[in-house]
Structures are given as C-alpha cells and as structure tokens.
C-alpha cells in the first residue's frame, strides 16, 4: 500500500495504537531491559528489580504469579522487564516486555509483505479507540472503524478473522482490520466460487462442520454448504450418519449467491445418477433383495445397494392389519426380499412390498374352509356392532346379531380381548376378502325350543312385556311373542297393561329369524268353531241363538 493510500485508510480521528496503549494499557514508550530481582515484598504485592546502576523499578507481583497463585520468580532471579519512565524508581512491567517481544518477533516474521495477511484471534480487551485482539500470544490493535462490530454489544471473548493493514516497528504495534478482511475474503470467495462453478471435474474438500441441515466443506480457504438434500441420491439424509469433521470429500459447486455470499456445493452431483441406471433394469413386479436402513412409525426405508432407497409402507409389511409399529417385524441392517410395486425415476420414488411375496392369509383360509365349517377364533377387537376374531392370519366378523339369539346382547358386554370362541362360518366374501361368523348358530335357538313344545294353532299364555305401535309383545315359554294390532281383537289395545296375562294362539314360527307370532282374534275364532262343532254333534236341541246368548 502506498503512503498516500495508507493515510487515506486511517482517518484523523484514529489515534496511533502506541498512544492508545499509552493511555489505556500503560504500554508507554520505553526500553526492554534485562533486570535482576533484588527484593520481594509479598505483603505490599511488589518486587524491586534492578535495571542497571542504582536504578530499581517496582514490579507488581501479579505479573509474575501463575494461575495457582505461585510466584514464577524468586529473589536474585534475572527477569526481562519493560522500563516505562526515568528516575531512580521507574515503573517496570514483565507482561509489557513479553508482549512487546512477541509483537516485535511477529513484525520481523511478517517482513515487508505483511499487508492483507490474515490472522484469527480472540478479542481480549477494549479501549476508547477499539479492541485488543490476541492471536498465538501476540496482541493486535483493531480500531473501532475497522471492526465492523456493533458499539453497544459486548464482544470480549469473540473470535474473529482480520487482515493486517499496518505495522509500526518503532512503537511495536500491529494494526488489523476486520472490514478489510471481509473485502478481501469476499473478492477471494467470488473468484474461487467462479472457478468451482466453471470446473468440469469434482474437487476435493475437507468437512469443516456438520449441522442438522447439511455439512460445510472447506476448499482453498473458503466454505461451501452441502445441503442435506445434496448429499445422496436417496434424498434428504442425516449428515452425521455419513460424515465427520476432517473427512475428505469430493464436491461440485452448483450455485453462488453473490448478495448473501453463499456457495452451494453438492456431493451427489459428483457421482452418476443411479436412477438412470435402474430405470431400464427394474420393473413393477420384480422381486429384489434389500437392506433395512431406517425405521419410522409410518414405514421402513430400504437400501437397494446403489445409493437409492425404497419405501416400504407399514401397510405393506404384513397381511396383519394390526401392525402397531414396523420395528415389531423388522430391524435396521436386516436383509429382506421385497416386491417392487411402483417405480418412478422422474420423481425418484420406489415403493416396495414385503407382504406381497407371501400368500395372502385370506386365500389360504378360503382354500381350507367353506361355509358351514366350525372354527375357533381369538377376540382381537371389540366394537359397538360386534367383535373381530383372529382365525390365524385373517380376521372374521362376529356381528352382535350373529353372536346371540337375544337381540339386545352385545359382544363387548360378554367377551374380552383374547377370549377364544367357537364359531360357525356363515359367509366367505371372496371379492371383499371378508368372513362372516356366527356363535348363536352353534346353540339351539329359543324359537327351536319353543317349536318343540308348540305348533301352529297351539294355545299359549304369556305376560305383556312391551307395547309397540305395531302390536304387543308377550313373554311365553322363554321367548317374546308378537301379537300384531289386527290380532288383538276383541281386546282393546289402549286398555292393555304391562304384566297383564293374555291367552292367544300361535299363528307363525320363523326359526331362521327367531320370531313367533300369535293372535287373540284367531283364538276367539277357533273357540267359535269348536263351539259350533260341538253344537252340531250334540243331542241337545239348543239353538245357535241360545249358545250365543249363553256366551254373552
């Protein structure tokens, strides 16, 4: 940098680092001397150091005390100190001497080509003109105007990168600029990014940091981000499962945002697209061998061996509809055979099935059983309308009305999960893959028991148990019998009470529907016929009118 440019770079408001240190850090101009500790006064916290002739300087003991509180020097030990003023008892500093020596050594190391050299250090101090930055034991001055830091924030302890912009051999100071670093770094990053974007071959970088959203890879001193979706052709993956800090990896640049200064890299772009490889080799219906790579509650991801993952939905794991979690059937690393049910290279989707390589339990059941067979099933699910029984790989429905002859009974009130029930197969629906079962058909129905005692036109007697719009139910011989409204005559329905005994005659017995109908009216007609028949066969010469009068 020229003298004119140098003067322009530092405005008039900035004070020389040496002067600032003189005011805030008391690093005043002076000399470094090899002295000798002549006395130590621990009570007052200082030591006297002879720096030549009769001159003795006062040295604060905290400058030569280690982290454990032990003195690093004793009486008569030689020590290098910085003499900051003249007189018989000048102030001397061990730390200033060491710091000044390190700065001077760094200046000599840098030589004349120091400009824009990059250092990385930590902010360890602050004064009114800027900040003190320490790097590898050397202190640098970062003026406020070159810091690119907010004035109202506490930056002590913050690690930064900056460029060296001035060295002062006479005053033993080195000035740095964070602002210049950004300018130089942005220019360099743009140049390297363009170089990467124009490159036709992958370049080798080093993994610098791993985050949940991707990995940062360093190349020629700049960082680029490989988003987790650009790591593998499998799609978004967990970066930690693939890489660790320090790993070498080939990458390609895919974009650079000049406004945000972000370089986007890709790992998967460095290898051939495996989807192009398989699109002509694999078809729906093919059986392939895969390895379980990840298990979620909704399904399983499987690796087909060439950086492509297929998806095995939870519903395609087993014919059992009650798969609570895939981990109950499969484990990570397990090798299995699956059937391809859908392949879409354009959208990079591969769906597979495990259960379709096994016989459908319904088909197996249907081949071994037929309607009318008696089987045993275990209660798997209870609902308001019935129970599902596991029949060994396939479920059958035992509806409430097929479980009990009593239409008011429900399975959930009489069975519990795990109960084993003997049932009869009522129906096998091949189209919908459904099986209907019955438990009540294995026991004699109340109607059948009733039919063994009573025939049509038999006279029965029962008590009224319910009154409906369409008729009256009486309970007779263990079964409810319906008397329709038109069969109640000569009884008046509005006069009938619950618990009232009614005598009637059986008019219908429906065993299949478990129903019995009766009639009071028919009983009356039957009685009339019997009386008329008795009159016709009797020797008594009573008239029909007499008989009717007697009846009334």
Swiss-Prot record:
A single Gene Ontology CC term: cytosolic small ribosomal subunit
UniProt keyword Heme, yes or no: no
Domain (S1 motif): residue spans on this chain: 31-101, 116-179, 200-268, 285-355, 372-440, 457-521
Ion transport keyword on record: no
GO molecular function annotations of the record: mRNA binding; structural constituent of ribosome
Source domain of life: Bacteria
Keywords from the named record: Repeat, Ribonucleoprotein, Ribosomal protein, RNA-binding
Any Pfam family the entry gives: S1
Any single GO BP term: translation
PROSITE patterns in the record: S1
Family stated for the protein in its record: Belongs to the bacterial ribosomal protein bS1 family.
Function (record text): Binds mRNA; thus facilitating recognition of the initiation point. It is needed to translate mRNA with a short Shine-Dalgarno (SD) purine-rich sequence.
PANTHER family the record matches: 30S RIBOSOMAL PROTEIN S1, SMALL RIBOSOMAL SUBUNIT PROTEIN BS1C
Name of protein: Small ribosomal subunit protein bS1
Native source species: Helicobacter pylori (strain J99 / ATCC 700824) (Campylobacter pylori J99)
């Amino acid at each position: 940098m020229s003298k004119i440019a140098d003067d322009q770079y530092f405005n008039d408001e900035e004070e020389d680092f040496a002067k600032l240190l003189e005011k805030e850090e008391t690093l005043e101009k002076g000399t470094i001397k090899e002295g000798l500790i002549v006395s130590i006064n621990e009570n007052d916290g200082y030591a006297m150091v002879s720096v030549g002739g009769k001159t003795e300087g006062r040295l604060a003991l905290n400058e030569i005390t280690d982290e454990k509180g032990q003195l690093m020097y004793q009486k008569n030990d030689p020590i290098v100190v910085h003499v900051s003023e003249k007189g018989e008892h000048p102030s001397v500093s061990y730390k200033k001497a060491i710091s000044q020596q390190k700065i001077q050594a760094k200046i000599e190391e840098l030589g004349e080509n120091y400009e824009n050299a990059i250092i990385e250090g930590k902010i360890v101090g602050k004064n009114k003109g800027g900040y003190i930055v320490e790097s590898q034991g050397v202190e640098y001055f970062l003026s406020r105007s070159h810091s690119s830091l907010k004035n109202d924030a506490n930056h002590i302890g913050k690690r930064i990168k900056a460029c060296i912009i001035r060295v002062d051999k006479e005053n033993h100071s080195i000035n740095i600029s964070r602002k210049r670093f950004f300018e130089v770094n942005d220019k360099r990053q743009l140049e390297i990014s363009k170089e990467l974007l124009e490159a036709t071959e992958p370049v080798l970088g080093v993994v610098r940091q791993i985050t949940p959203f991707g990995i940062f890879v360093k190349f020629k001193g700049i960082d680029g981000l490989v988003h987790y979706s650009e790591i593998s052709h499998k799609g978004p993956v967990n970066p930690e499962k693939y890489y660790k800090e320090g790993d070498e990896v080939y990458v390609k640049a895919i974009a650079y945002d000049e406004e945000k200064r972000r370089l986007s890299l890709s790992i998967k772009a460095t290898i051939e697209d495996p989807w192009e490889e398989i699109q002509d080799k694999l078809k729906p219906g093919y059986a392939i061998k895969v390895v379980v790579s990840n298990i979620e509650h909704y399904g399983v991801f499987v690796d087909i061996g060439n950086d492509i993952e297929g998806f095995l939905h939870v519903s395609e794991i087993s014919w059992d509809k009650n798969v609570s979690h895939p981990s109950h059937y499969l484990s990570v690393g397990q090798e299995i055979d699956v059937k391809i049910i859908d392949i879409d290279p354009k959208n990079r989707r591969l769906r597979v099935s495990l259960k379709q390589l096994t016989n459908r339990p319904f088909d197996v059941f249907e081949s071994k059983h037929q309607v009318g067979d008696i089987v045993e099933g275990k209660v798997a699910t209870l609902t308001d309308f019935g129970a599902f029984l596991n029949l060994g790989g396939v479920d059958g429905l035992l509806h409430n009305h097929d479980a009990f002859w009593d239409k008011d009974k429900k399975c959930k009130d009489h069975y519990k999960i795990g109960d084993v029930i003997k049932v009869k197969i009522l129906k096998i629906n091949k189209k919908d893959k459904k099986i209907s079962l019955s438990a009540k058909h294995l026991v004699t129905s109340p109607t059948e028991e009733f039919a063994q005692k009573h025939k049509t036109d038999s006279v029965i007697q029962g008590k009224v148990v319910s009154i409906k719009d369409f008729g009256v139910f009486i309970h007779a011989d263990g079964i409810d019998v319906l008397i329709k409204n038109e069969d109640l005559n000569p009884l008046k329905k509005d006069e009938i009470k619950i618990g009232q005994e009614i005598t009637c005659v059986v008019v219908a017995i429906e065993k299949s529907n478990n129903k019995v109908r009766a009639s009071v009216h028919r009983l009356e007609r039957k009685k009339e016929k019997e009386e008329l028949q008795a009159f016709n066969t009797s020797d008594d010469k009573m008239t029909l009118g007499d008989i009717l009068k007697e009846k009334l």
